[in-house]
Amino acid sequence: EVVDLGWNVGPGLMAGEVDAIIGVYWTYESIVMGREGFETNVIYPHDWNVPSYYELVLVTSEDNVENNPDLVERFVSAFNKGYEQAASDPQGSVDTMLALNPDAEIDEVTDREGVELLAPLWKSGSAEVGSLDGSRWDSLVEWMKTQDLVGDSLVAADAYDSSFSK
């Protein structure tokens, strides 16, 4: 049975409303739940024969790309610069987030722990920030077709545009 917990996934799991959760940020919820004495076991989909996939991607409409290419290009460029800076100074990225969001409710301790879990992933691999591997998308789409998650007509290359990343 699938249960929609909304954004209340950690408390829902800890209260026994569900046996497992998916689609959470393992670098956040697992830390918060651990701090509350709840033991977690992070399951990585690729360990269960799900092809590797891109998790955090920038999304815009085809209309925006067509009508505002300069805006999209500048946004992607700024995003990539921020990502590269965060990868080179993870704790500094948390400092920047806190400085730019003084009124936000930010769990600084959790974010500092979480960024240390992410940092090795940011620096792994030889691909440049913002690059996409078409074969990775192809593998995921083909797997999704075998699981009846998408229709047979879906073409992976139609779902992304990496022309704004340099």
Regions found by a protein language model. Name each.
Residues 61, 133, 161-162:
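Residue-level signal for threonine
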Residues 137-166:
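Conserved C-terminal helix/tail region of periplasmic/extracytoplasmic solute-binding proteins
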Residues 16-18, 127-128:
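Short, contiguous strand/loop micro-motifs
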